[in-house]
């Protein structure tokens, strides 16, 4: 009887265990279902584009607009990067003065020792940013020869934020310097790898993936292609007269066009539409109005280009700027309309990534497009 009693208890225990297992399975399935629904409800945006096109600045704008911006500690951590931008900028300009053809001399020969000092600190990685350094930078930036070399920066590789920070050297050099949001947007740090930013707009979840744009970073892009709602392709329109860092030969805008074409025609992406951010419109306008670098010298077809009748210029926009920006837009649209089979589309927008209001407006305009892409992705449309 003892044996029978024991077996009965074991059977009872097994029943309890089975019930607990079923309950546990139900909980797991419920959680998985919840995660599946959350995954389906999330809009995944992949930011692509050539190096230095402004992708990371777009991500920073999303943080400012939708993730409570940057806290004091994060701002403090960026001070060193900003001062490194100042150092890189002045080192690059001063070094280029003797290498560009024809070379540019210092306007004030008394600044020679300052130039020598800047060149001497160039290789130092853990540099201490002393007041002596900032004083030399300020004096050199005031030198007309240095300014003349800066004006020819398309002949060498100079970070976009050079002028911005060199003109703000008094603020950046302060002991109690606190970067502004605009300083953080302008700060240049090379993106290596894949960075994900999560944010919510009107209760809709967005995941934005920022991938390094340099050639050796692009092989990582394929890891992000799975289940992407849309691609935001960022092109630096002001780069029409510049060459890429990787080979100092290939035109940057041509590189961006070639990259766009390879993404547009990629067999894995033939159903994913592209939102095209024609970026750096502020810098494009400056170059066009300065008249020193003519677009037709780099893109001969510009000489015969006519602005489309349906083109809408911005209020007060110079016709030369309107013509330039629509020409570059049409270079990209020519690629997207040549192929596509109606399975994916290209939606162009003129952007200035450092202008928070511009990005707010453009992203709001894009949200309906992204929503339609998302519904189509899960065959709900």
From Swiss-Prot:
Binding site for Mg(2+): 56, 191, 210
MF-aspect GO terms: adenylate cyclase regulator activity; G protein activity; G protein-coupled receptor binding; G-protein beta/gamma-subunit complex binding; GTP binding; GTPase activity; metal ion binding
Region annotation (G5 motif) ranges: 351-356
Gene3D superfamilies: GI Alpha 1, domain 2-like, P-loop containing nucleotide triphosphate hydrolases
Lipidation (N-palmitoyl glycine): 2
Main location per the UniProt record: membrane
Region Disordered, annotated ranges: 1-25
Gene Ontology cellular-component annotations: cytoplasm; extracellular exosome; heterotrimeric G-protein complex; plasma membrane
Quaternary structure and interacting proteins, as annotated: G proteins are composed of 3 units; alpha, beta and gamma. The alpha chain contains the guanine nucleotide binding site. Interacts with GAS2L2. Interacts (GDP-bound form) with RIC8B (via C-terminus); promoting GNAL folding and association with the plasma membrane.
Protein name according to UniProt: Guanine nucleotide-binding protein G(olf) subunit alpha
Annotated organism of origin: Homo sapiens
Native organism taxonomy: Eukaryota, Metazoa, Chordata, Craniata, Vertebrata
Gene behind the chain: GNAL
